[in-house]
């Protein structure tokens, strides 16, 4: 009952059969706004479990994908510093829903901008401020989008060239006579 006392929190479990969850840290349970230092980690969460929300707010169900999060919160005398590391692996949108509350955002296009060449979305979202008025910076998200766009633009011509030369594993070198550009009939 002492508001200055601190408690250690350590919860290990699973969401479903294959998705580990860890919640660990220290807090003042009767005055968390004075001091909290806690981490929430979720791994391998199957994204289709969020279909009731994605269908309602994004206008699409989720066909597949996995969610991994590492969320860290520090509160010291009402001052918040938080770091959200989020990885979404192989997100694929499914069928459109008939939601009246969906955001009119191009979610499929936005997803394609956020994905890297391996189909992974990595986001780091810092939040800082007082717990009465937290703010977050979108700069890291914008830079991630720009990096992914540039990577796709740089590799696109090479992917097209690679598609032209399918079966190149059977290609062989052709020897020319010195100073000649004529092909040998056997080539």
Per-region residue spans from a language model:
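Small-residue helix/turn framework positions
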Residues: 1-126, 143, 164-173
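Periplasmic peptidoglycan-binding/tethering modules of Gram-negative envelope proteins
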Residues: 136-187
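Extended catalytic-interface subdomain
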Residues: 121-124, 130-137
């Amino acid at each position: 009952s002492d508001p200055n006392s601190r408690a250690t929190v350590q919860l290990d479990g699973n969401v479903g059969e294959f998705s580990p969850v860890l919640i660990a840290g220290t807090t003042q349970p009767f005055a968390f706004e004075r001091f909290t230092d806690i981490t929430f980690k979720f791994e391998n969460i199957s994204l289709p479990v969020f279909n009731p929300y994605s269908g309602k707010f994004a206008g699409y169900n989720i066909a597949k994908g996995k969610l991994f999060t590492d969320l860290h919160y520090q509160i010291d005398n009402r001052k918040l510093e938080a770091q959200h590391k989020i990885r979404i692996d192989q997100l694929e949108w499914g069928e459109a829903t008939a939601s009246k509350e969906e955001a009119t955002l191009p979610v499929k296009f936005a997803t394609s901008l956020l994905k890297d060449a391996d189909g992974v979305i990595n986001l780091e979202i810092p939040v800082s401020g007082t717990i009465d008025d937290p703010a977050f910076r979108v700069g890291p998200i914008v830079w991630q989008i720009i990096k992914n766009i540039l990577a796709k633009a740089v590799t696109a011509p090479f992917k097209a060239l690679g598609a032209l030369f399918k079966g190149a594993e059977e290609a062989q070198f052709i020897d020319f006579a010195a100073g000649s550009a004529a092909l040998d009939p056997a080539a």
